[in-house]
Swiss-Prot record:
InterPro entries: AD (IPR047574), Lsm12-like (IPR039683), LSM12_ABD (IPR019181), LSM12_LSM (IPR048478), Sm (IPR047575). Keywords: Acetylation, Cytoplasm, Phosphoprotein. The modification Phosphothreonine is found at residue 75. Residues 2-72 form the Sm domain. This is Protein LSM12. The modification N-acetylalanine is found at residue 2. Nicotinic acid adenine dinucleotide phosphate (NAADP) binding protein. Confers NAADP sensitivity to the two pore channel complex (TPCs) by acting as TPC accessory protein necessary for NAADP-evoked Ca(2+) release. It is found in: Cytoplasm. One of its GO terms (cellular component) is cytoplasm. GO terms for molecular function: RNA binding. Found in a complex with LSM12, TPCN1 and TPCN2. Interacts with TPCN2. Residues 80-174 form the AD domain. The keyword Acetylation applies.
Length: 195
């Protein structure tokens, strides 16, 4: 069903609107669905990074005021082609990672074990759970409590590499804890000095 004239937004137009929470939003229209009254705006990045943008989905039923700042009348550029196989592969990978994470939680793996698994998986994709054990490249098995000395396998480069990753992971975790403790103590020191 086509939208009646005057009740739609052209892709590429600049639009400003006020939400029901009195927030002013402004950006370029990237999509508009007339039936659901949903508007997608491309706005400057909230992170401030150049060459990045935020895409906001706005339900126009909750907008009190809409103003078209610059209406685009020419035909919008053609949509970019999508690499469907790449998207499917990424979705499959994400699903596998979430299932692996869910398995670890249901198996009662400690938070430290889950974090170590994620650290290893960033470097070596070929790692999986086998009950509560982490199996890396079908060669190295890490058993609870997941320390360097819990890495077992045939002596060689794979075992050595995994041990280095585990060692670095726990060094980084310890550094993070020290940093958090010092940040937590800073307000206490300032309060003691000001009294």
């Amino acid at each position: 069903m086509a939208a009646p004239p005057g009740e739609y937004f052209s892709v590429g137009s600049q639009v400003s609107c006020r939400t029901c929470q009195e927030q002013r939003l402004q950006g370029e229209v990237v999509a508009f669905d007339y039936q659901s009254k949903m508007l997608a705006l491309k706005c400057p990045s909230s992170s401030g990074k150049p060459n990045h943008a935020d895409i906001l989905l706005i339900n126009l039923q909750y907008v009190s005021e809409v103003e078209i700042i610059n209406d685009r009348t020419e035909t919008p550029p053609p949509l970019a082609s999508l690499n469907v196989s790449k998207l499917a592969s990424k979705a499959r990978t994400e699903k596998e990672e979430k299932l692996s994470q869910a398995y670890a939680i249901s198996a009662g793996v400690s938070l430290e074990g889950q974090q170590l698994f994620q650290t290893i998986h960033k470097t070596i994709k070929d790692c999986k759970w086998q009950e509560k054990n982490i199996v890396v490249m079908e060669e190295v098995v890490i058993t609870p409590p997941y320390q360097v000395e819990n890495c077992k396998g045939k002596e060689g480069s794979a075992l050595s590499h995994v041990r280095k990753i585990v060692e670095k992971h726990f060094r980084d975790v310890e550094s993070q804890k020290i940093l958090q403790r010092s940040q937590a103590q800073q307000p206490q020191k300032e309060a003691a000095l000001s009294s």
